[in-house]
Protein backbone atom coordinates (compact mmCIF):
# COMPACT_ATOMS: atom_id res chain seq x y z
CA UNK A 1 0.00 0.00 0.00
CA UNK A 2 1.08 3.64 -0.30
CA UNK A 3 3.26 5.10 2.44
CA UNK A 4 4.52 8.53 3.51
CA UNK A 5 7.94 9.00 1.91
CA UNK A 6 8.90 11.99 4.07
CA UNK A 7 7.92 10.17 7.24
CA UNK A 8 10.18 7.22 6.43
CA UNK A 9 13.03 9.57 5.50
CA UNK A 10 12.68 11.18 8.91
CA UNK A 11 12.56 7.84 10.73
CA UNK A 12 15.62 6.57 8.88
CA UNK A 13 17.65 9.65 9.81
CA UNK A 14 16.62 9.40 13.45
CA UNK A 15 17.05 5.63 13.86
CA UNK A 16 17.92 3.73 10.70
CA UNK A 17 17.81 0.26 12.28
CA UNK A 18 14.36 0.87 13.77
CA UNK A 19 13.04 2.28 10.47
CA UNK A 20 14.45 -0.71 8.61
CA UNK A 21 12.64 -3.15 10.89
CA UNK A 22 9.38 -1.21 10.38
CA UNK A 23 9.58 -1.74 6.61
CA UNK A 24 7.08 -4.65 6.47
CA UNK A 25 4.40 -2.40 7.99
CA UNK A 26 3.80 -0.79 4.58
CA UNK A 27 2.90 -4.11 2.95
CA UNK A 28 -0.74 -5.04 2.47
CA UNK A 29 -1.27 -8.48 4.04
CA UNK A 30 -1.73 -11.01 1.26
CA UNK A 31 -4.35 -13.04 3.04
CA UNK A 32 -4.68 -16.75 2.35
CA UNK A 33 -6.21 -16.18 -1.11
CA UNK A 34 -3.24 -14.06 -2.08
CA UNK A 35 -0.68 -16.75 -1.27
CA UNK A 36 0.97 -19.22 -3.58
CA UNK A 37 -0.22 -21.65 -4.97
CA UNK A 38 -3.53 -19.79 -5.39
CA UNK A 39 -1.64 -16.70 -6.56
CA UNK A 40 0.18 -17.52 -9.75
CA UNK A 41 1.01 -16.18 -13.18
CA UNK A 42 -0.16 -18.50 -15.90
CA UNK A 43 0.47 -18.76 -19.61
CA UNK A 44 -2.39 -19.49 -21.96
CA UNK A 45 -1.98 -22.91 -23.54
CA UNK A 46 -1.90 -23.24 -27.34
CA UNK A 47 -3.58 -26.21 -28.94
CA UNK A 48 -0.87 -28.80 -29.77
CA UNK A 49 -1.96 -29.15 -33.40
CA UNK A 50 -2.01 -25.41 -34.03
CA UNK A 51 1.31 -25.02 -32.25
CA UNK A 52 2.86 -27.49 -34.71
CA UNK A 53 1.09 -25.73 -37.59
CA UNK A 54 2.64 -22.42 -36.53
CA UNK A 55 6.12 -23.93 -36.18
CA UNK A 56 5.83 -25.48 -39.64
CA UNK A 57 4.75 -22.16 -41.13
CA UNK A 58 7.65 -20.33 -39.52
CA UNK A 59 10.11 -22.99 -40.69
CA UNK A 60 8.86 -22.98 -44.27
CA UNK A 61 9.03 -19.19 -44.39
CA UNK A 62 12.57 -19.27 -43.00
CA UNK A 63 13.49 -21.71 -45.80
CA UNK A 64 12.35 -19.24 -48.46
CA UNK A 65 8.96 -20.77 -49.33
CA UNK A 66 6.01 -18.47 -50.03
CA UNK A 67 2.73 -19.38 -48.36
CA UNK A 68 -0.26 -20.30 -50.52
CA UNK A 69 -3.91 -21.08 -49.86
CA UNK A 70 -5.08 -23.87 -52.12
CA UNK A 71 -8.74 -24.44 -53.08
CA UNK A 72 -10.59 -26.48 -50.49
CA UNK A 73 -13.46 -27.47 -52.78
CA UNK A 74 -12.33 -29.60 -55.73
CA UNK A 75 -14.51 -30.72 -58.62
CA UNK A 76 -14.84 -34.44 -59.20
CA UNK A 77 -13.45 -34.01 -62.72
CA UNK A 78 -10.14 -32.78 -61.26
CA UNK A 79 -9.69 -36.08 -59.44
CA UNK A 80 -10.00 -37.91 -62.78
CA UNK A 81 -7.50 -35.52 -64.39
CA UNK A 82 -4.95 -36.10 -61.63
CA UNK A 83 -5.36 -39.82 -60.95
CA UNK A 84 -6.49 -41.18 -64.30
CA UNK A 85 -7.86 -44.74 -64.08
CA UNK A 86 -7.11 -44.80 -60.33
CA UNK A 87 -9.66 -42.04 -59.72
CA UNK A 88 -12.58 -44.36 -58.92
CA UNK A 89 -10.70 -45.92 -56.02
CA UNK A 90 -9.61 -42.49 -54.77
CA UNK A 91 -13.12 -41.04 -54.95
CA UNK A 92 -14.29 -43.69 -52.50
CA UNK A 93 -12.32 -41.79 -49.86
CA UNK A 94 -13.55 -38.26 -50.53
CA UNK A 95 -16.50 -36.35 -49.12
CA UNK A 96 -18.98 -35.09 -51.70
CA UNK A 97 -20.70 -31.81 -50.96
CA UNK A 98 -24.48 -31.84 -50.88
CA UNK A 99 -27.33 -29.56 -49.99
CA UNK A 100 -31.08 -29.31 -49.71
CA UNK A 101 -32.96 -28.56 -52.91
CA UNK A 102 -35.32 -25.60 -52.95
CA UNK A 103 -38.91 -26.82 -53.22
CA UNK A 104 -41.38 -25.50 -55.74
CA UNK A 105 -44.09 -24.40 -53.32
CA UNK A 106 -47.57 -23.83 -54.71
CA UNK A 107 -50.31 -21.77 -53.07
CA UNK A 108 -53.86 -23.02 -53.54
CA UNK A 109 -57.05 -22.12 -51.73
CA UNK A 110 -56.35 -24.81 -49.14
CA UNK A 111 -53.00 -23.23 -48.18
CA UNK A 112 -54.53 -19.75 -48.04
CA UNK A 113 -57.28 -20.97 -45.69
CA UNK A 114 -54.70 -22.51 -43.37
CA UNK A 115 -52.58 -19.33 -43.40
CA UNK A 116 -55.65 -17.21 -42.59
CA UNK A 117 -56.53 -19.56 -39.73
CA UNK A 118 -53.08 -19.15 -38.21
CA UNK A 119 -53.01 -15.36 -38.69
CA UNK A 120 -56.63 -14.93 -37.55
CA UNK A 121 -57.42 -12.64 -40.49
CA UNK A 122 -58.00 -12.73 -44.22
CA UNK A 123 -55.17 -12.53 -46.77
CA UNK A 124 -55.78 -9.87 -49.41
CA UNK A 125 -55.25 -10.58 -53.14
CA UNK A 126 -52.25 -8.23 -53.12
CA UNK A 127 -50.66 -10.06 -50.21
CA UNK A 128 -51.38 -13.38 -51.93
CA UNK A 129 -49.51 -12.24 -55.03
CA UNK A 130 -46.53 -10.98 -53.00
CA UNK A 131 -46.47 -14.29 -51.15
CA UNK A 132 -46.23 -16.18 -54.46
CA UNK A 133 -43.47 -13.85 -55.67
CA UNK A 134 -41.48 -14.35 -52.46
CA UNK A 135 -41.68 -18.15 -52.61
CA UNK A 136 -40.78 -18.06 -56.30
CA UNK A 137 -37.77 -15.85 -55.52
CA UNK A 138 -36.65 -18.38 -52.92
CA UNK A 139 -36.96 -21.20 -55.47
CA UNK A 140 -34.88 -19.24 -58.01
CA UNK A 141 -32.23 -18.35 -55.43
CA UNK A 142 -32.78 -14.58 -55.34
CA UNK A 143 -33.83 -14.93 -51.68
CA UNK A 144 -31.49 -16.85 -49.37
CA UNK A 145 -32.79 -19.50 -47.03
CA UNK A 146 -31.84 -17.56 -43.90
CA UNK A 147 -33.80 -14.55 -45.22
CA UNK A 148 -37.00 -16.41 -46.13
CA UNK A 149 -38.67 -16.15 -42.72
CA UNK A 150 -37.98 -12.42 -42.52
CA UNK A 151 -39.26 -11.81 -46.06
CA UNK A 152 -42.45 -13.78 -45.46
CA UNK A 153 -43.03 -11.96 -42.17
CA UNK A 154 -42.81 -8.63 -44.01
CA UNK A 155 -45.25 -9.79 -46.71
CA UNK A 156 -47.78 -11.25 -44.26
CA UNK A 157 -47.27 -8.46 -41.69
CA UNK A 158 -46.78 -11.10 -39.01
CA UNK A 159 -44.07 -11.92 -36.51
CA UNK A 160 -41.39 -14.52 -37.16
CA UNK A 161 -42.98 -17.07 -34.79
CA UNK A 162 -46.22 -17.08 -36.82
CA UNK A 163 -44.28 -17.46 -40.08
CA UNK A 164 -42.29 -20.41 -38.70
CA UNK A 165 -45.61 -22.02 -37.70
CA UNK A 166 -46.96 -21.43 -41.22
CA UNK A 167 -43.89 -22.98 -42.87
CA UNK A 168 -44.16 -26.04 -40.64
CA UNK A 169 -47.94 -26.55 -40.79
CA UNK A 170 -48.93 -25.28 -44.25
CA UNK A 171 -45.92 -26.20 -46.39
CA UNK A 172 -44.82 -29.78 -45.57
CA UNK A 173 -42.49 -29.60 -48.59
CA UNK A 174 -39.91 -27.91 -46.36
CA UNK A 175 -39.97 -30.74 -43.81
CA UNK A 176 -39.71 -33.46 -46.43
CA UNK A 177 -36.57 -32.18 -48.11
CA UNK A 178 -33.67 -34.63 -48.47
CA UNK A 179 -30.06 -33.62 -49.25
CA UNK A 180 -28.79 -34.08 -52.79
CA UNK A 181 -25.12 -34.54 -53.63
CA UNK A 182 -23.20 -32.34 -56.05
CA UNK A 183 -20.09 -33.19 -58.06
CA UNK A 184 -17.94 -31.05 -55.78
CA UNK A 185 -15.70 -32.71 -53.20
CA UNK A 186 -13.77 -31.62 -50.14
CA UNK A 187 -10.02 -31.72 -50.70
CA UNK A 188 -8.76 -35.12 -49.54
CA UNK A 189 -5.07 -34.26 -49.98
CA UNK A 190 -3.17 -31.08 -50.76
CA UNK A 191 -2.05 -32.30 -54.20
CA UNK A 192 -5.56 -31.67 -55.56
CA UNK A 193 -5.09 -27.99 -54.79
CA UNK A 194 -1.48 -27.74 -55.99
CA UNK A 195 -2.40 -28.67 -59.57
CA UNK A 196 -5.00 -25.89 -59.64
CA UNK A 197 -2.66 -23.33 -58.08
CA UNK A 198 0.37 -24.13 -60.23
CA UNK A 199 -1.66 -24.13 -63.44
CA UNK A 200 -2.36 -20.45 -62.82
CA UNK A 201 1.12 -19.45 -61.59
CA UNK A 202 3.86 -21.39 -63.35
CA UNK A 203 4.08 -19.07 -66.38
CA UNK A 204 3.64 -15.88 -64.35
CA UNK A 205 6.51 -16.18 -61.84
CA UNK A 206 10.24 -16.56 -61.92
CA UNK A 207 11.26 -20.22 -61.76
CA UNK A 208 11.78 -22.13 -59.58
CA UNK A 209 8.54 -21.53 -57.70
CA UNK A 210 8.63 -22.54 -54.03
CA UNK A 211 5.27 -22.64 -52.26
CA UNK A 212 3.90 -24.23 -49.09
CA UNK A 213 0.51 -24.61 -47.46
CA UNK A 214 -0.51 -25.95 -44.05
CA UNK A 215 -4.24 -26.49 -44.12
CA UNK A 216 -7.18 -28.84 -43.64
CA UNK A 217 -7.90 -31.94 -45.68
CA UNK A 218 -10.81 -34.36 -45.36
CA UNK A 219 -10.74 -38.10 -45.90
CA UNK A 220 -13.75 -40.43 -45.63
CA UNK A 221 -12.25 -43.11 -43.42
CA UNK A 222 -14.34 -46.13 -42.46
CA UNK A 223 -13.85 -45.05 -38.86
CA UNK A 224 -11.57 -42.80 -36.86
CA UNK A 225 -8.92 -44.40 -34.69
CA UNK A 226 -5.76 -43.70 -32.71
CA UNK A 227 -3.85 -42.79 -35.90
CA UNK A 228 -6.62 -41.71 -38.30
CA UNK A 229 -8.96 -38.73 -38.45
CA UNK A 230 -11.48 -37.76 -41.08
CA UNK A 231 -10.42 -34.12 -40.82
CA UNK A 232 -6.68 -33.58 -40.61
CA UNK A 233 -3.99 -31.01 -41.45
CA UNK A 234 -1.51 -31.45 -44.28
CA UNK A 235 1.79 -29.57 -44.38
CA UNK A 236 2.72 -29.62 -48.05
CA UNK A 237 5.17 -27.83 -50.32
CA UNK A 238 6.03 -27.78 -54.03
CA UNK A 239 9.10 -26.76 -56.00
CA UNK A 240 8.38 -26.14 -59.70
CA UNK A 241 11.23 -25.48 -62.13
CA UNK A 242 13.07 -26.71 -65.18
CA UNK A 243 15.86 -28.43 -63.24
CA UNK A 244 13.93 -29.89 -60.31
CA UNK A 245 15.05 -33.36 -59.21
CA UNK A 246 14.23 -35.82 -56.46
CA UNK A 247 17.17 -34.46 -54.45
CA UNK A 248 15.02 -31.41 -53.63
CA UNK A 249 12.82 -33.64 -51.48
CA UNK A 250 15.77 -34.92 -49.46
CA UNK A 251 17.17 -31.45 -48.84
CA UNK A 252 13.78 -30.02 -47.87
CA UNK A 253 13.05 -32.95 -45.54
CA UNK A 254 16.23 -32.34 -43.58
CA UNK A 255 15.83 -28.56 -43.43
CA UNK A 256 12.18 -28.79 -42.37
CA UNK A 257 12.33 -31.64 -39.89
CA UNK A 258 15.59 -30.69 -38.19
CA UNK A 259 13.61 -27.79 -36.69
CA UNK A 260 11.62 -30.41 -34.74
CA UNK A 261 14.60 -32.18 -33.20
CA UNK A 262 15.23 -34.84 -35.83
CA UNK A 263 18.93 -35.45 -36.40
CA UNK A 264 19.38 -38.15 -39.04
CA UNK A 265 17.36 -39.02 -42.13
CA UNK A 266 16.77 -42.09 -44.24
CA UNK A 267 14.94 -42.23 -47.58
CA UNK A 268 13.42 -45.34 -49.12
CA UNK A 269 11.00 -46.06 -51.99
CA UNK A 270 7.34 -46.03 -51.01
CA UNK A 271 5.51 -49.28 -51.74
CA UNK A 272 2.36 -47.26 -52.43
CA UNK A 273 2.53 -45.80 -55.94
CA UNK A 274 0.18 -42.87 -56.48
CA UNK A 275 -0.48 -42.27 -60.17
CA UNK A 276 0.05 -38.52 -59.88
CA UNK A 277 3.76 -39.18 -59.12
CA UNK A 278 6.35 -40.30 -61.68
CA UNK A 279 7.34 -43.98 -61.42
CA UNK A 280 10.15 -44.66 -58.91
CA UNK A 281 9.96 -41.18 -57.34
CA UNK A 282 7.50 -41.66 -54.46
CA UNK A 283 9.75 -41.72 -51.39
CA UNK A 284 9.17 -42.24 -47.67
CA UNK A 285 11.14 -40.11 -45.22
CA UNK A 286 12.33 -41.69 -41.98
CA UNK A 287 13.99 -39.54 -39.34
CA UNK A 288 15.77 -40.34 -36.11
CA UNK A 289 14.31 -38.71 -33.03
CA UNK A 290 16.51 -38.49 -29.90
CA UNK A 291 13.76 -40.11 -27.81
CA UNK A 292 11.63 -42.17 -30.20
CA UNK A 293 14.28 -43.46 -32.59
CA UNK A 294 13.50 -43.96 -36.30
CA UNK A 295 9.98 -42.86 -37.30
CA UNK A 296 8.24 -42.27 -40.64
CA UNK A 297 7.38 -38.59 -40.95
CA UNK A 298 6.87 -37.53 -44.59
CA UNK A 299 6.50 -38.53 -48.24
CA UNK A 300 7.74 -36.80 -51.37
CA UNK A 301 7.83 -37.40 -55.11
CA UNK A 302 7.79 -35.71 -58.52
CA UNK A 303 4.46 -35.17 -60.21
CA UNK A 304 3.81 -37.20 -63.34
CA UNK A 305 4.05 -35.25 -66.63
CA UNK A 306 0.76 -36.88 -67.61
CA UNK A 307 -1.03 -35.28 -64.66
CA UNK A 308 0.79 -31.96 -65.07
CA UNK A 309 -0.10 -31.86 -68.76
CA UNK A 310 -3.81 -32.00 -67.87
CA UNK A 311 -3.33 -28.56 -66.29
CA UNK A 312 -0.93 -27.17 -68.88
CA UNK A 313 2.02 -27.21 -66.46
CA UNK A 314 5.18 -27.68 -68.51
CA UNK A 315 7.93 -28.01 -65.88
CA UNK A 316 8.75 -30.73 -63.32
CA UNK A 317 7.24 -30.31 -59.86
CA UNK A 318 8.52 -31.88 -56.65
CA UNK A 319 5.93 -32.26 -53.88
CA UNK A 320 6.56 -33.08 -50.21
CA UNK A 321 3.79 -33.64 -47.71
CA UNK A 322 3.41 -34.68 -44.11
CA UNK A 323 0.52 -35.01 -41.70
CA UNK A 324 0.59 -32.35 -39.02
CA UNK A 325 -1.21 -34.63 -36.58
CA UNK A 326 1.38 -37.34 -37.19
CA UNK A 327 4.18 -34.89 -36.42
CA UNK A 328 2.30 -33.66 -33.34
CA UNK A 329 1.97 -37.23 -32.06
CA UNK A 330 5.75 -37.58 -32.31
CA UNK A 331 6.46 -34.18 -30.77
CA UNK A 332 4.09 -34.77 -27.83
CA UNK A 333 4.76 -38.53 -27.62
CA UNK A 334 1.04 -39.25 -27.86
CA UNK A 335 -0.41 -42.64 -28.75
CA UNK A 336 -3.89 -41.42 -29.75
CA UNK A 337 -4.35 -38.63 -32.26
CA UNK A 338 -8.00 -38.27 -31.26
CA UNK A 339 -7.07 -37.34 -27.70
CA UNK A 340 -4.34 -34.97 -28.89
CA UNK A 341 -6.70 -33.22 -31.32
CA UNK A 342 -9.87 -33.17 -29.21
CA UNK A 343 -8.73 -33.42 -25.57
CA UNK A 344 -12.02 -31.93 -24.37
CA UNK A 345 -13.78 -35.22 -25.15
CA UNK A 346 -11.41 -37.32 -23.06
CA UNK A 347 -10.83 -37.53 -19.28
CA UNK A 348 -8.89 -34.48 -18.13
CA UNK A 349 -5.78 -35.03 -16.08
CA UNK A 350 -5.20 -32.51 -13.29
CA UNK A 351 -1.91 -32.34 -11.42
CA UNK A 352 -1.59 -32.15 -7.64
CA UNK A 353 -0.31 -28.62 -8.16
CA UNK A 354 -3.53 -27.65 -9.94
CA UNK A 355 -5.70 -29.24 -7.25
CA UNK A 356 -3.73 -27.39 -4.56
CA UNK A 357 -4.46 -24.11 -6.35
CA UNK A 358 -8.17 -24.97 -6.31
CA UNK A 359 -8.37 -25.10 -2.49
CA UNK A 360 -9.67 -21.78 -1.11
CA UNK A 361 -11.12 -20.26 2.03
CA UNK A 362 -14.89 -19.93 2.22
CA UNK A 363 -14.71 -16.67 4.18
CA UNK A 364 -11.91 -14.10 4.43
CA UNK A 365 -11.67 -10.60 5.87
CA UNK A 366 -11.93 -7.88 3.24
CA UNK A 367 -10.10 -4.96 4.81
CA UNK A 368 -6.40 -4.50 5.52
CA UNK A 369 -7.23 -4.25 9.23
CA UNK A 370 -9.23 -7.47 9.00
CA UNK A 371 -6.33 -9.30 7.33
CA UNK A 372 -3.95 -8.08 10.02
CA UNK A 373 -6.46 -9.23 12.62
CA UNK A 374 -6.46 -12.72 11.06
CA UNK A 375 -2.66 -12.84 11.19
CA UNK A 376 -2.72 -11.72 14.82
CA UNK A 377 -5.29 -14.39 15.76
CA UNK A 378 -3.18 -17.07 14.09
CA UNK A 379 0.05 -15.88 15.73
CA UNK A 380 -1.50 -15.61 19.21
CA UNK A 381 -3.16 -19.01 18.99
CA UNK A 382 0.05 -20.64 17.75
CA UNK A 383 2.13 -19.02 20.50
CA UNK A 384 -0.20 -20.14 23.31
CA UNK A 385 -1.55 -23.32 21.71
CA UNK A 386 -0.73 -25.53 24.69
CA UNK A 387 -1.89 -23.10 27.39
CA UNK A 388 -4.27 -24.91 29.78
CA UNK A 389 -7.82 -23.68 30.13
CA UNK A 390 -9.54 -21.71 31.24
CA UNK A 391 -7.41 -19.03 29.59
CA UNK A 392 -7.76 -15.94 27.39
CA UNK A 393 -5.27 -13.92 25.32
CA UNK A 394 -5.78 -10.59 23.61
CA UNK A 395 -4.78 -11.11 19.98
CA UNK A 396 -5.54 -7.75 18.38
CA UNK A 397 -6.81 -4.26 19.08
CA UNK A 398 -7.72 -1.85 16.35
CA UNK A 399 -10.40 0.01 14.47
CA UNK A 400 -12.98 -1.61 12.20
CA UNK A 401 -15.72 0.45 10.54
CA UNK A 402 -15.02 3.38 12.87
CA UNK A 403 -15.26 1.27 16.02
CA UNK A 404 -12.54 0.12 18.38
CA UNK A 405 -12.47 -3.66 18.50
CA UNK A 406 -10.60 -6.00 20.81
CA UNK A 407 -10.14 -9.62 19.71
CA UNK A 408 -9.60 -12.37 22.27
CA UNK A 409 -8.56 -15.99 21.73
CA UNK A 410 -9.81 -18.06 24.65
CA UNK A 411 -10.56 -21.46 26.09
CA UNK A 412 -13.32 -21.16 28.71
CA UNK A 413 -13.30 -24.80 29.87
CA UNK A 414 -11.00 -26.64 32.24
CA UNK A 415 -8.83 -29.65 31.46
CA UNK A 416 -8.33 -28.53 27.86
CA UNK A 417 -5.76 -26.52 25.92
CA UNK A 418 -6.23 -23.28 24.02
CA UNK A 419 -5.97 -25.06 20.65
CA UNK A 420 -7.02 -28.54 19.67
CA UNK A 421 -4.40 -30.93 18.20
CA UNK A 422 -5.57 -30.45 14.60
CA UNK A 423 -5.00 -26.68 14.54
CA UNK A 424 -1.45 -27.28 13.30
CA UNK A 425 -2.59 -29.61 10.49
CA UNK A 426 -1.52 -28.40 7.05
CA UNK A 427 -3.50 -29.13 3.89
CA UNK A 428 -1.57 -31.10 1.24
CA UNK A 429 -2.52 -32.65 -2.09
CA UNK A 430 -0.92 -36.05 -2.57
CA UNK A 431 -1.64 -38.40 -5.47
CA UNK A 432 -4.89 -36.56 -6.19
CA UNK A 433 -6.23 -36.60 -2.62
CA UNK A 434 -6.65 -33.54 -0.39
CA UNK A 435 -5.37 -34.31 3.10
CA UNK A 436 -5.03 -32.32 6.32
CA UNK A 437 -2.00 -33.79 8.08
CA UNK A 438 0.16 -32.95 11.13
CA UNK A 439 3.94 -32.72 11.00
CA UNK A 440 4.68 -36.20 12.33
CA UNK A 441 6.55 -39.24 10.99
CA UNK A 442 3.34 -41.02 9.96
CA UNK A 443 2.61 -38.35 7.35
CA UNK A 444 6.21 -37.68 6.27
CA UNK A 445 5.65 -39.10 2.76
CA UNK A 446 2.62 -36.89 2.18
CA UNK A 447 4.46 -33.78 3.34
CA UNK A 448 7.59 -34.57 1.31
CA UNK A 449 6.01 -35.77 -1.94
CA UNK A 450 2.71 -33.89 -1.87
CA UNK A 451 1.98 -30.30 -2.84
CA UNK A 452 1.23 -27.91 0.00
CA UNK A 453 -1.75 -25.60 -0.32
CA UNK A 454 -0.04 -23.18 2.06
CA UNK A 455 -3.05 -23.40 4.39
CA UNK A 456 -3.18 -24.78 7.92
CA UNK A 457 -6.39 -25.36 9.83
CA UNK A 458 -5.33 -22.49 12.07
CA UNK A 459 -4.91 -20.19 9.02
CA UNK A 460 -8.40 -21.04 7.81
CA UNK A 461 -10.13 -20.71 11.17
CA UNK A 462 -8.31 -17.44 11.98
CA UNK A 463 -9.55 -15.98 8.69
CA UNK A 464 -13.07 -17.20 9.45
CA UNK A 465 -13.02 -15.52 12.86
CA UNK A 466 -11.60 -12.28 11.43
CA UNK A 467 -14.22 -12.21 8.66
CA UNK A 468 -17.10 -12.74 11.13
CA UNK A 469 -15.72 -10.14 13.58
CA UNK A 470 -15.20 -7.66 10.73
CA UNK A 471 -18.79 -8.11 9.53
CA UNK A 472 -20.21 -7.87 13.06
CA UNK A 473 -18.25 -4.67 13.75
CA UNK A 474 -19.84 -2.99 10.73
CA UNK A 475 -23.20 -3.62 12.42
CA UNK A 476 -21.92 -2.47 15.80
CA UNK A 477 -22.10 -5.98 17.21
CA UNK A 478 -19.72 -8.32 18.97
CA UNK A 479 -18.92 -11.75 17.55
CA UNK A 480 -18.26 -15.19 18.98
CA UNK A 481 -16.69 -17.81 16.70
CA UNK A 482 -16.10 -21.37 17.83
CA UNK A 483 -14.83 -24.29 15.74
CA UNK A 484 -14.92 -27.73 17.30
CA UNK A 485 -14.46 -31.04 15.47
CA UNK A 486 -13.78 -30.89 11.73
CA UNK A 487 -15.38 -33.50 9.50
CA UNK A 488 -15.89 -31.60 6.25
CA UNK A 489 -13.90 -28.88 4.44
CA UNK A 490 -16.55 -26.32 5.38
CA UNK A 491 -15.98 -27.08 9.08
CA UNK A 492 -12.54 -25.45 8.80
CA UNK A 493 -13.62 -22.71 6.39
CA UNK A 494 -12.32 -24.46 3.25
CA UNK A 495 -13.85 -25.02 -0.18
CA UNK A 496 -12.58 -26.89 -3.22
CA UNK A 497 -13.45 -25.68 -6.70
CA UNK A 498 -16.03 -27.80 -8.48
CA UNK A 499 -13.80 -28.96 -11.34
CA UNK A 500 -11.14 -30.19 -8.90
CA UNK A 501 -13.76 -31.86 -6.72
CA UNK A 502 -15.16 -33.67 -9.76
CA UNK A 503 -11.65 -34.85 -10.68
CA UNK A 504 -11.16 -36.17 -7.14
CA UNK A 505 -14.41 -38.15 -7.15
CA UNK A 506 -14.02 -39.39 -10.76
CA UNK A 507 -10.61 -40.84 -9.89
CA UNK A 508 -11.74 -42.35 -6.57
CA UNK A 509 -9.50 -40.04 -4.55
CA UNK A 510 -10.51 -38.54 -1.22
CA UNK A 511 -10.81 -35.35 0.78
CA UNK A 512 -9.85 -35.95 4.41
CA UNK A 513 -9.81 -32.79 6.50
CA UNK A 514 -10.92 -34.29 9.78
CA UNK A 515 -9.52 -33.45 13.18
CA UNK A 516 -10.16 -31.84 16.59
CA UNK A 517 -9.69 -28.07 16.12
CA UNK A 518 -11.43 -26.63 19.22
CA UNK A 519 -10.62 -22.93 18.88
CA UNK A 520 -12.71 -20.07 20.26
CA UNK A 521 -12.37 -16.41 19.26
CA UNK A 522 -14.55 -13.50 20.33
CA UNK A 523 -14.60 -9.74 19.90
CA UNK A 524 -15.37 -6.94 22.35
CA UNK A 525 -16.57 -3.46 21.31
CA UNK A 526 -16.60 -0.56 23.79
CA UNK A 527 -19.96 1.17 24.15
CA UNK A 528 -18.94 4.37 22.36
CA UNK A 529 -17.60 4.32 18.79
CA UNK A 530 -14.40 6.25 18.13
CA UNK A 531 -14.64 9.65 16.53
From Swiss-Prot:
Residues that coordinate or bind substrate: 189-191, 234-236, 276-277, 319
Domain of life from the UniProt record: Archaea
Amino-acid biosynthesis is among the record's keywords: no
GO MF terms held by the record: ATP binding; phosphoserine-tRNA(Cys) ligase activity; tRNA binding
Reaction catalyzed: tRNA(Cys) + O-phospho-L-serine + ATP = O-phospho-L-seryl-tRNA(Cys) + AMP + diphosphate
Keywords: Aminoacyl-tRNA synthetase, ATP-binding, Ligase, Nucleotide-binding, Protein biosynthesis
HAMAP family: Sep_tRNA_synth
Family, per entry: Belongs to the class-II aminoacyl-tRNA synthetase family. O-phosphoseryl-tRNA(Cys) synthetase subfamily.
UniProt-listed NCBIfam families: sepS (TIGR00470)
Name of protein: O-phosphoserine--tRNA(Cys) ligase
Organism: Methanoculleus marisnigri (strain ATCC 35101 / DSM 1498 / JR1)
Lineage: Archaea, Methanobacteriati, Methanobacteriota, Stenosarchaea group, Methanomicrobia
Gene this chain is encoded by: sepS
